[in-house]
């Protein structure tokens, strides 16, 4: 993978993906006929995805303000409560009218992307902003979070509108590929991982892809890029980076698998829902 979205030199490209995916999200929500359409997110309609985006975007702005002031943020909640807490946040905005909700999201989003655009190289790499669930993270993580949200949730809305076979744009999914390994690391279900000692491979085709070997042992997941997967107990092969991203977010069960069926089954049941 030649492109590293975490490097400052990738900033302009990453922010272009944010704007592109946000525009696609807005295209769906700006149609009033879509407001009450069910989405791929269980229990959420289009209006709730808008609520979710208000929740996280305003949350990022608040945390950025805390960091700029040099104040101490509340302790991270951890990932195991992420799904339930985000659900509460999204549904709390149902009291807003459609017009109020959309205006509030767009206002917050413009403020956040303006902050992203002004980040210096030192800030991109070293300015830490405390995430509600993850704790202190470097600034470059936050544009990626926006790509995850706008990219995957636009897919969720299109799924609800009838396009069940859609893929994320290759560039969008490609930018997210490195982050999927981090998500896997932090979402290992400790009960499912008990006694698991496996090594498996990930292969993603195309210019955004590569090969990685993953080891799971003692409830911990580690990974490294490799040239050879011949000693992996199983291999998950994704022909499009979208398949990897949507599988990570448990929207689909994508890719082709080869190797030990027991290992494949363990991997598929290794992660809790985020």
Please give the residue ranges for each predicted region:
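Amphipathic, well-ordered alpha-helical segments in soluble domains
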Residues: 21-28, 56, 108-111, 115-118, ...
